[in-house]
Each structure stands twice: as structure tokens, then as C-alpha cells.
């Protein structure tokens, strides 16, 4: 059996407490949490609670709502971690659950997923999540 639950992000919402998850924001349809292999402090993932592999399989209404939710989170990230812009990326090849990356950036190279990832402690992740949440 090859399903979202057995492979990754799809169940991150359902499996809170079982796997590392630093929540930033949540509503009835979407969940935002820190990427545990961040490119920058504040690198956040936004996912729909609905299990869907490909972001463009979401209904038009849900896709639009996801981007409005992501915008609120991105604005909070930008306040918590001053940057030129908060970049948005949708890749979706490694993780079989639709998600948006929100990454604080000073230049375009900050968005390269081949860049080294930050190694942060549990305390650092908690402080970053709190800083973003306080700006919402």
C-alpha cells in the first residue's frame, strides 16, 4: 500500500505529538508549521488539512483560500524575520501532500533548495514559531 499516511506530510496534521511539528497557524482548512530542514529561520510550510498530493488538484476555492491563508502567514514571517521578501515555492516531488514553502529571503539564491539547511535546536524552533505566531 502506497498512501499519503505512510509517506510523509499528509499526516503531519493528524500526527501532532508523534513527529516534530512547530505550529505557526491553523484554521479549519489549513495548517502552517516550520520546515524541520529550513533554508532560513522562518521557513514555513502551509498544507491543506484535506489529503491531496498535487496542489492543483485542490478545488479553485480551496486553492485560492490556501493562498490567502499563506499570505497572512507570509506577512507575519516578514515581520518576525525582516527580509526583502518572503518567497513562495511549490515543488511537491518528494512529499506526497500539497504544500507551499514560505521562505524569508534577501535575494533569489536564498530560495535554492540545494543550499545547506540550517541545523536548529528544539528551543530555536520553538522561539521561531512563537515569533511568527505573535505577528499574526
Language-model features and meaning:
Residues 107-136:
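Conserved His + Asp/Glu catalytic blocks
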Residues 45-67, 113-120:
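Short histidine-centered catalytic/ligand-binding loop motif
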Residues 81-93:
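A short glycine-rich, hydrophobically flanked beta-strand micro-motif that places a catalytic Asp/Glu
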Residues 14-58:
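N-terminal first-folded block
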